[in-house]
């Protein structure tokens, strides 16, 4: 086993992605990796009490111990409710007359 772990810390905004690679000692937690990366000073809008964190798309608590080659991800809160966004997409496709949008209409009104 190596003396250090290679870990990446990732935070993505719509127009900018931050990916920082670190060498950290074994037994390091998710919170320690985020602090060591400096991503909190680079992006002061990150609030770890509101933003969820994870490793490779799986939600993890801040005290989770990391393994070698883990990618720590900081997730932004959702801007739009997923159910509402889907309803808007269906309405838009109905208005545009696409086959996908019309499949939800009764057969006699197609």
Swiss-Prot record:
Alphabetical list of Gene3D superfamilies matching this protein: RnfH-like
A Pfam family: Ub-RnfH
InterPro entries to which the protein is assigned, alphabetical: Mopterin_synth/thiamin_S_b, RnfH, RnfH_sf
Biased composition (Basic and acidic residues): 88-110
Region entry Disordered, spans: 86-110
Family recorded in the similarity comment: Belongs to the UPF0125 (RnfH) family.
Protein name (record): Protein RnfH
Annotated source species: Paraburkholderia phymatum (strain DSM 17167 / CIP 108236 / LMG 21445 / STM815)
């Amino acid at each position: 086993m190596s003396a250090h772990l290679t870990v990446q810390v990732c935070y993505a905004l719509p127009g900018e992605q931050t990916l920082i690679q670190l060498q950290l000692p074994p037994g390091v937690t998710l919170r320690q990796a985020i602090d060591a990366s400096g991503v909190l000073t680079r992006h002061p809008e990150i609030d770890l009490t509101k933003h969820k964190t994870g490793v490779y798309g799986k939600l993890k608590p801040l005290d989770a111990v990391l393994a070698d080659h883990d990618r720590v991800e900081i997730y932004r809160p959702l801007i739009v409710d997923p159910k509402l966004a889907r309803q808007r997409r269906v309405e838009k496709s109905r208005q545009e007359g696409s086959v996908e949008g019309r499949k939800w209409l009764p057969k006699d009104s197609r």
